[in-house]
């Protein structure tokens, strides 16, 4: 054996070298340094010294600590590494004082032997006879006590030291249950070592045995209490689930009555609960120490060898698992784990290693009962995300995404859906969807309306909208009434804005709204009809009923507004008022003298004929309507038109419909709000207040309001700001949701069609109605091949930011009655941005139309240039067939394509390979001359064939 020094020996013994030197000196081994060599004799002397010094009491205590690692999955499924430390302690004691000298070597030999057998005892499960031979159990009679019947230990109370002891395990209960269950008493085991008195045996002291028995009794009582608590909880859960199921069945039977034969048995749903609750009944009286365990009945089937109420000793260790056995029957070796989510301890993340054994979940909370799907009533707001919609329906978001994918929409979990799409998804998944009434600040407006004290209603002036086809004389008629000259100053002689005026007549005041007649201004006419009391329909006597005339009639009828027809231009030659009446009757506008309820007035705006008669008819109609409105109340009205003025900011034309608007009032109009800083009448004069039916221009709003928005005065500016911000956010969400839906709907179509050429535009106009009309008209020009893409449209002058946007996107800027400032012009020149100015909507539409026409791909046409007849064929080897032809019509060109026609049927269409006249190549051969023609890739020519020459030319297209 190789010698080692003191330091190496101390490292092997895991102790300090200085401490080992002291022990060597005490044993009489003279070593002065840790580097001194140690012989085998020195080690024997040290061992003898230690035996003599420590065995005087007749007892040897062995301690052992093992550390290992276990990998297990936690509740979330992630793998964890758990440190497991096992501590063991063994006390060996000599039985008699006389045997002490002889027993010392035996104890020294048995101690390492016992330690070596301990790790082997855990994986082994001997199925031999219960009584072991004394020669194989050194010190086991004192350590091994009788095994009491125990329930399955709780995970928190597990004792690793006791679980690691070698234990005999009885065979499965089959033929001889009494023998398999019985266990020898300690008295019987104590007599066996006496048969071999020559061999010393170590036993535990009586105090140690008594303390261990007391500890086991305490643990058994504790486990019994825990079993009772668990059993009570399971029974309570079973009763609750049975009651819940019974209530559901009653509700289902009340909703859908079924025949008695189809009803399920009452006891069927409770069967799983009974199996759980009866799994651990109260154990019977425990057998006395050393007594045999009670055996099951001999006639019990194999499956009943471990009944649900068999107590805890069935779960303590059997040599083998019975068929389909539970994890409770795995020999008691399973280490308790953390009980989570009502599952078995073995499935927790602190559970012991599985070693390939089947895992069975504790079915404590796995109650499954037949139930019909629950239908939810889902309240859907204007916009909602996919995640929120899934939460409202109590389904996974993946189900909603799957349903949307079936509808052709690719969405994410945070995608915003509009209300219409969300309602379709809710119905698709079998729930009931309803549009939600949003809990928004606008409810404050309804409450405020309810708190208003009834004000005195007074007579108000009628609001009259003048409508009709373009160039039928609407503005000229208003000029004659107002004694003004508005029409003369309008660009192109047509009205492109909605105007509001009020006129004082001897019989009262009348407010007029002048609407454009051009087809592009449909939205303006609709707003005019919405805000009006009476519609004056102007029809030119020499022109008749036109498309915009019919549209105006539809607007008036949709708004439920009476119509007064003014037949204009009766002084012109060719005027035919009777024809006008007949055409209007076809549109369900019947004159009074024909038995209808519509007044017809023949006027001439140019000559001023019968203007008073028109005013009389308007006031007469107003008297019939009995128009009233409160005066001493907060003002309410409608935004007729709005624009952005460079010096004054946002300017809105407001028609007051009820109440009185005063300077300084807080006004809310759509997403704009603010205090009224100034009020101007139609002549530009400042006024302090405006009553019902008075049109005014107001300054001071935070933003340009939308034309057609309702406006109202609020008492609290803070509340007005809150409502405006809420509306702006809601409008933005709805717009983004609709844009996203449109993108998704058109995605596959765009992929199939390929890239569509687009003309990007930026539109800036003087008023909001103008850019709405212009943008709508230009977008109507789009086709499948080219389209108008409006990047931005707004009110006001052309700014530097507009030019930068146009430069980044290669867009054209259209200024309608606006101009670019100096900075914008410089930036436009530097970046080469094209800015076009227009003041007539016709010109803008025509130029954009021509630009789109230039973007269209040209159309290809065939043009026949000549015809030749084959007179003779020449076959040349390695060259092919050459046709001797006579040009009988037109001209044959070298670049032409050739069609071979035989008996009036085209047999070949291809290219010309060579064209010769005599031996020379020529570019063309005219009518009346012969030539030689060879076709590329075609030699099956016959005499008499017709050769038709044609060219493909490109023709420019237009919209």
Swiss-Prot record:
GO molecular function, one term: GTP binding
Region G2: start-end pairs: 493-497
Biased composition (Low complexity): 98-114, 122-131, 178-201, 243-259, 275-311
Region (Disordered): 55-201, 233-370
Region named G1: 468-475
Occurrences of domain tr-type G (ranges): 459-628
Family under the similarity heading: Belongs to the TRAFAC class translation factor GTPase superfamily. Classic translation factor GTPase family. IF-2 subfamily.
Name the record gives this protein: Translation initiation factor IF-2
Lineage, top ranks: Bacteria, Pseudomonadati, Pseudomonadota, Betaproteobacteria, Neisseriales
Gene designation: infB
């Amino acid at each position: 054996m190789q010698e080692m020094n003191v330091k190496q020996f101390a490292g092997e013994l895991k102790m300090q070298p200085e401490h080992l030197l002291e022990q060597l000196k005490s044993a009489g081994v003279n070593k002065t340094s840790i580097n001194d060599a140690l012989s085998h004799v020195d080690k024997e002397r040290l061992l003898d010294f230690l035996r003599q010094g420590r065995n005087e009491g007749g007892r040897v205590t062995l301690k052992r600590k093992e550390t290992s690692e276990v990998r297990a999955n936690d509740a979330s499924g992630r793998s964890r590494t758990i440190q497991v430390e096992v501590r063991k302690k063994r006390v060996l004691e000599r039985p008699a004082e006389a045997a002490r000298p002889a027993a010392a070597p035996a104890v020294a030999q048995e101690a390492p032997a016992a330690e070596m057998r301990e790790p082997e005892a855990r994986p082994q499960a001997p199925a031999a006879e219960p009584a072991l031979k004394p020669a194989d159990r050194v010190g086991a009679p004192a350590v091994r006590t009788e095994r009491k019947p125990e329930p399955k230990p709780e995970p928190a109370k597990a004792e690793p030291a006791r679980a690691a002891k070698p234990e005999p395990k009885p065979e499965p209960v089959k033929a001889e249950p009494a023998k398999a269950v019985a266990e020898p008493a300690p008295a019987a085991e104590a007599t066996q070592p006496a048969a071999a008195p020559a061999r010393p045996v170590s036993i535990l002291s009586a105090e140690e045995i008594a303390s261990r028995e007391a500890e086991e009794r305490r643990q058994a009582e504790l486990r019994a209490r825990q079993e009772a608590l668990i059993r009570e909880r399971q029974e309570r859960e079973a009763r609750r689930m049975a009651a819940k199921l019974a209530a559901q069945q009653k509700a289902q039977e009340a909703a859908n009555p079924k025949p008695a034969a189809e009803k399920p048995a009452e006891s069927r749903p409770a069967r799983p609960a009974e199996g759980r609750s009866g799994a651990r009944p109260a154990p019977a009286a425990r057998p006395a120490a050393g007594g045999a365990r009670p055996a099951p009945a001999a006639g019990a089937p194999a499956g009943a060898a471990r009944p649900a109420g068999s107590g805890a000793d069935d779960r303590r260790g059997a040599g083998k698992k019975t068929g389909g056995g539970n994890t409770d029957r795995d020999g008691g070796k399973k280490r308790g784990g953390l009980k989570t989510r009502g599952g078995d301890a073995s499935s927790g993340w602190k559970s012991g290693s599985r070693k390939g054994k089947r895992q069975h979940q504790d079915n404590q909370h796995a109650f499954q009962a037949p139930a019909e799907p629950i239908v939810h009533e889902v309240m859907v707001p204007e916009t909602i995300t996919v995640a929120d919609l899934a939460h409202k329906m109590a389904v996974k978001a993946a189900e909603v995404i799957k349903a949307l994918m079936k509808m052709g929409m690719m969405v994410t979990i945070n995608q915003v859906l509009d209300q219409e799409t969300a309602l379709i998804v809710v119905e698709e998944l079998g729930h009931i969807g309803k549009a939600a009434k949003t809990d928004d600040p606008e409810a404050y407006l309804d409450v405020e309306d309810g708190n208003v004290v009834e004000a005195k209603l007074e007579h108000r002036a009628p609001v009259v909208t003048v409508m009709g086809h373009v160039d039928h004389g609407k503005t000229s008629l208003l000029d004659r009434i107002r004694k003004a000259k508005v029409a003369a100053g309008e660009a192109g002689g047509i009205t492109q804005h909605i105007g509001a005026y009020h006129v004082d007549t001897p019989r009262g005041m009348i407010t007029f709204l002048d609407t454009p007649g051009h087809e592009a201004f449909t939205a303006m006419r609709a707003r005019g009809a919405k805000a009006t009391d009476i519609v004056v329909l102007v029809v030119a006597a020499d022109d008749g009923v036109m498309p915009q005339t019919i549209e105006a009639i539809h607007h008036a009828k949709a708004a439920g507004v009476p119509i007064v027809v003014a037949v204009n231009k009766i002084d012109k030659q060719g005027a035919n008022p009777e024809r006008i009446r007949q055409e209007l009757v076809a549109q369900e506008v019947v004159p009074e003298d024909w038995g209808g309820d519509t007044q017809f007035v023949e006027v001439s705006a140019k000559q001023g004929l019968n203007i008073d008669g028109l005013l009389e008819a308007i006031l007469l109609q107003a008297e019939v309507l009995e128009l009233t409105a409160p005066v001493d109340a907060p003002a309410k009205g409608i935004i007729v038109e709005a624009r952005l003025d460079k010096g004054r900011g946002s300017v809105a034309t407001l028609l007051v419909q009820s109440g009185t608007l005063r300077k300084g009032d807080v006004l809310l109009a759509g997403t704009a709000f603010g205090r009224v800083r100034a009020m101007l009448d139609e002549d530009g004069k400042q006024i302090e207040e405006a009553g019902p039916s008075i049109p005014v221009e107001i300054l001071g709003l935070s933003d340009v309001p939308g034309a057609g928005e309702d406006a109202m005065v609020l008492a609290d500016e803070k509340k007005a700001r809150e409502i405006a911000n809420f509306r702006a956010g809601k409008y933005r969400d709805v717009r983004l949701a609709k844009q996203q839906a449109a993108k998704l709907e058109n995605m596959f179509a765009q992929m199939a069609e390929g890239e569509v050429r687009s003309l990007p535009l930026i539109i800036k106009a003087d008023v909001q109605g103008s850019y709405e009309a212009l943008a709508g008209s230009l977008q109507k020009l789009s086709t499948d091949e080219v389209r108008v893409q409006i990047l931005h449209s707004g009110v006001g002058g052309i700014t530097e930011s507009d030019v930068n946007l146009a430069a980044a996107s290669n867009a054209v800027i259209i200024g309608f009655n606006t101009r670019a400032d100096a900075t914008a012009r410089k930036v436009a020149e530097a970046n080469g941005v094209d800015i076009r100015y227009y003041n007539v909507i016709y010109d803008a539409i025509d130029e954009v139309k021509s630009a789109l026409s230039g973007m269209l791909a040209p159309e290809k046409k065939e043009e026949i240039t000549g015809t030749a007849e084959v007179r003779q064929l020449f076959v040349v080897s390695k060259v092919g067939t050459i046709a001797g032809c006579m040009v009988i019509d037109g001209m044959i060109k070298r670049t032409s394509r050739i069609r071979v026609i035989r008996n009036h049927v085209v047999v070949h269409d291809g290219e010309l390979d060579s064209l010769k006249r005599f031996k020379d190549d020529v570019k063309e051969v005219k009518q009346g001359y012969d030539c030689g023609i060879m076709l590329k890739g075609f030699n099956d020519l016959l005499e008499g064939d017709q050769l038709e020459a044609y060219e493909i030319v490109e023709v420019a297209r237009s919209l």
